[in-house]
Amino acid sequence: MEFFEEIAKFRAARRIYAKILKEKFHARNSKSWHLRFHVQTSGESLTAQQVDNNVVRVALEAMAGVLGGCQSLHTNSRDEALSIPTEDSVKIALRTQQIIANETGVTKTVDPMGGSYYIEYLTAKIEQEVEKYLKRIGRMGGALAAIEKGFFQEEIRRNAYQLKKEIDDGKRTIVGVNKFQDAHDIEPQLNSMDMKIETRQIAVLKEFKRNRDKIKVDSSISQLQAAAQNENENLMPYILQAVKNHVTLGEISDTFEEIFGRYEPRVSF
C-alpha cells in the first residue's frame, strides 16, 4: 500500500462523487453530494510469513481509511492469509480500530490531511486519471457493458500480475517475504473448525423455515418476481418486505436467478 496515495484515493472519490451528483444528476440537496463509504483493509497485503507483521499493515491501512474520510471500517485479522482468524486475532483487529478512534485524535478533524501539498497533488492527479477511466467506460456503453466485455476483470488481472512480478523480481519489498526473512519463523496457532457446525446450522435453518408463515413467504416471493420483471421497478421495498416475512437470502437470490440468470464471467488469458 502507498499510504499517502490511499488517503488521496478516498479524497478523490469524494470529490468525483459530489461532482457527478451535482453536474450530471443535478442533485439539489447538498447532503446527497456526500459520499458515504465503508473501508476494509486489504486481504491481498496479508502475508503467510511472519503473521504478526500483518498487525502493523492492517493498522496503517486502517489509518489511511480514516484519514481519507471513511464512515465505517473493517480491519482484517493478522492470520487471514492462512485460515479463518482466531478469536485473539479478531480481538487485536478490533482493538486496532479502537486505538485509532480513541487514542490518536484523528477523528476530531474533518479531512485532517487537507491542505498538504503532497496530498492535494495526489488527490488532483487521481481525480484526473479516474475521469479518464470513466470516459473510457462510458465509450464502452457503461459499466454493465464493460463487465460483459471483461474490461474490469482484465484490469484487475493485469495489475495483480504486475504486482506479483515486482515482488518476485525484488522491485517491491514485502517484509518477511522477499526481504528480512526469518529462517525460524514461528508457526502461528490457527483456528480449528468444528465440522459439526454445518449440521447444526442446517437444523436451525430447517426449524426457522418450519415456523414462518408460508402464505406470507410465497406472497413475498411472487411480488418480488413480478417486480424484478419490470425494469422500471425499485426492487428494494420488495426485498425489505420479503426479509420482514422471513424469506431467506438464498430464496431471494434464487428468485433473481430465475429471472436474470446466473452471471458467467468472461475468461481471458
Specify the residue positions occupied by each region the protein language model found:
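Append "with occasional cross-activation on large, charged helical scaffolds in nucleic-acid assemblies
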Residues: 31, 46-48, 71, 144, ...
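Short secondary-structure boundary/capping segments
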Residues: 10-14, 52-55, 88-92, 259
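A general structural signal for short secondary-structure junctions and capping/turn motifs
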Residues: 27-29, 64-66, 136, 165-168
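Active-site-adjacent bridging/hinge elements
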Residues: 34-36, 69-72
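Gly/Pro-rich turn-and-neighbor structural signature
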Residues: 1-53, 135
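Flexible, glycine-rich loop/tail regions that form catalytic "lids" or insertion modules at the edges
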Residues: 86-87, 95-98, 102-269
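Short beta-alpha connecting loops at secondary-structure transitions
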Residues: 1-5, 39-52, 58, 73-88, ...
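Structured alpha-helical segments in the cores of large, soluble enzyme domains
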Residues: 13-14, 18-28, 56-69, 92-104
